[in-house]
Amino acid sequence: MDQLQQSLLEAPIIEKDGYHYFVHPISDGVPMLEPNLLREIVIKIIRKAQLENVDKIVTPAAMGIHISTAVSLMTDIPLVVIRKREYGLDGETPLFQQTGYSENQMYINDVDEGDSVLVLDDVLSTGGTLSAICSALEDIGADIVDVVAVIKKVGGENELESSPYSAKTLINVDVEDGEVVIIDSNGDN
């Protein structure tokens, strides 16, 4: 069993407002993220993602940053972080992100018309974040080469499914009876 799968099976579950969350180093920063787990995930992303001709890796703050930084270092592809803070810089594009549990305004800089991008995130659950990002990138005129999320939490409505985009994932899980259940250890292609 690989480290990602094992770490998810051992993840604590919390409930907040009727929504069951697994607490995991990739999605939450706790417990501590072991380098071997991060390395395994980065290697899997590099093997699964379409990286040819990608100009930029685009990721939302905050929990996509550590994964995307490591992928950027391994591939020499520059990293763009979509932030929750507006700076008012030239070319800044706002987007509205709505998930099953939060709503935020986010801001994209340094992505231009014609850029070929890989969208990378930690978890695909409701699809609200990735759907909003893909829509904003499309409005900018960027070419979305691929979308990858490390973990897919199945069992709920996924906004990305009703968009023209789909996400590759490394592993698909659900939370049943207070435990993480592995639905597909290879994720979606």
From Swiss-Prot:
What CDD domains does the record point to? PRTases_typeI
Gene Ontology terms, MF aspect: transferase activity
Q: Which domain of life is it from?
A: Archaea
The biological process GO terms on file are: purine ribonucleoside salvage
Q: Its Enzyme Commission number? A: 2.4.2.-
| Keyword Transferase set for record | yes
Keyword annotations of the record: Purine salvage, Transferase
Which InterPro entries does this one have? HGPRTase-like, PRibTrfase_dom, PRTase-like, Pur/Pyrimidine_PRTase
One Pfam entry name: Pribosyltran
What family classification does the UniProt entry report for this protein? Belongs to the purine/pyrimidine phosphoribosyltransferase family. Archaeal HPRT subfamily.
What is the documented function of this protein? May catalyze a purine salvage reaction, the substrate is unknown.
The protein's name: HGPRTase-like protein
Origin species: Natronomonas pharaonis (strain ATCC 35678 / DSM 2160 / CIP 103997 / JCM 8858 / NBRC 14720 / NCIMB 2260 / Gabara)
Print the organism lineage: Archaea, Methanobacteriati, Methanobacteriota, Stenosarchaea group, Halobacteria
